[in-house]
Amino acid sequence: MTKYVFVTGGVVSSLGKGIAAASLAAILESRGLKVTLLKLDPYINVDPGTMSPFQHGEVFVTEDGAETDLDLGHYERFISTKMRKANNFTTGQIYESVIRKERRGDYLGKTVQVIPHITNEIQAFVERGAASATCGEPDVAIVEVGGTVGDIESLPFLEAARQMSLRLGRNSACFVHLTLVPFIATAGELKTKPTQHSVQKLREIGIYPNVLLCRADRRIPDDERAKISMFSNVPEDAVISVWDVDSIYKIPQMLHDQGLDELICEELKLTARPADLSIWSEMVEKLENPKSEVTIGMVGKYVELTESYKSLIEALRHASIHTSTKVNIEYIDSEELEENGVDSLKHLDAVLVPGGFGRRGTEGKIKAIRYAREAKVPYLGICLGMQLAVIEFARDVVGLKDANSTEFDQDTPNRVVALITEWYDREGKVEKRTEESDLGGTMRLGSQRCPIKPGTMAEEIYGKDVNERHRHRYEVNNRFVPQLEGGGLIISARTPSEDLPEMMELPRSMHPWFVGVQFHPEFTSTPRDGHPLFKAFVEAARAHHEASVEEKV
């Protein structure tokens, strides 16, 4: 039978519940247990797909095409279990499901209320999510409850967790509460009162935490832990200090050293072998002892909130681990390039243009792409970054000066990138869309396998085929491919059913390393293995850096 660990948060948001939950999962998995994770989001949006990256951060896409919270990316990076649509649900989905049932008459004329109907639905979603785990029936399902204790939006989720714990019985569920212990500089001391109040609030709604994870910018002294223990009625050995570190991949070892996994196993009566975190120690060792260093410029319009590119940043860190190369990322606002030109790019060892939507900042990205192509600087374009690379090539090499995407200019005569109106989904069914379609859930989403053209750089990186995740509406227009190929551009991978361009590159006779991909490879990168495309990109950046140093000498 699956046992549950509910992870809640208090005092403030953004303390790192997702990292804490993923780290605990990693330790339990290293003990031989089958683990899955779920994220409950209290917002009323059905999913984060149409939310602004400035508001929500990155949208993480699962293998089965769900647009989910970025914490699911952390989950996949920390454990081997793959996430699915059922691993993340929102208040919007819960209410949508309950209202649909009410309209069908499933409640037999009863008054539909938050308790029991909404809370029962939440419990059903949690159990269904755990049961659908890709690892088979999990020993442990770790359930992260979004928001903070005291938020009105989170109350139904917390009540559902309380009811579920009671229903499942002793040793079947436990609660881990992540809370803030701030350091007040003027007083020169850590303050435990916010944590005391947070636990008190949790207890008021009937939840008694088994473990406290106390976040601070420094290690919390034992006397402060004892104080927290006394006022929160949590045993002192279950008051765990979680301090700031320079790499999230150090956190599993930090939590294990303080016995978190043993506490959970004891509380849930789980029998498991000792934890083996050697792989995490090795990763941290490689991360901290690089043999070379490169600087990569990430050119985007959401650079003020780097959470918008979370998986991409982590994928570069993974490549750093596996190439023994320190990767410094410079975030470059594409709108500034439109105004000030590309001089700010000239010290970079490589340029990366990530995915995005909308016209704003696109001409700045195109300037960056032209610079990378002409200066022979390694370039990687992801999703929109590939589309803009094709547009730049069409304009500046092929000579189609007004080439554009219909996303930005409906009237352009040279629609090099356009909206595809019909395609096959993962089940082989025909999906259709138009400019007037709803934004939510109308993109090409999820994993798709496609063959790679022999003799290309793509084949060197991936092998015979590629299986990556998608999130986009617009595609490179096949009508212009002959002209693009006539200019030297290579379409190195295509979808098998619709024959749509999935990868492009320039031959080495034109550029040492210039690659664009329509999919999002960052979603499948893990610290354990890295990702072949990002490793190749970092190696190309390193080669460019070394060549530049030799030229200066």
UniProtKB/Swiss-Prot annotation:
User: One Pfam family for this entry, by name?
Assistant: GATase
* Domain of life per record: Bacteria
Instruction: State its role.
Output: Catalyzes the ATP-dependent amination of UTP to CTP with either L-glutamine or ammonia as the source of nitrogen. Regulates intracellular CTP levels through interactions with the four ribonucleotide triphosphates.
Q: Which InterPro entries match?
A: Class_I_gatase-like, CTP_synthase, CTP_synthase_N, GATASE, GATase1_CTP_Synthase, P-loop_NTPase
Task: Tell me what this protein is called.
Answer: CTP synthase
Q: Which reaction does it catalyse?
A: UTP + L-glutamine + ATP + H2O = CTP + L-glutamate + ADP + phosphate + 2 H(+); L-glutamine + H2O = L-glutamate + NH4(+); UTP + NH4(+) + ATP = CTP + ADP + phosphate + 2 H(+)
Residues that coordinate or bind CTP: 13, 151-153, 191-196, 227
Residues holding UTP: 13, 191-196, 227
Query: Residues in the active site?
Result: 383 (nucleophile), 520, 522
List residues binding Mg(2+): 71, 144
A GO MF term? glutaminase activity
Query: Subunit structure, briefly?
Result: Homotetramer.
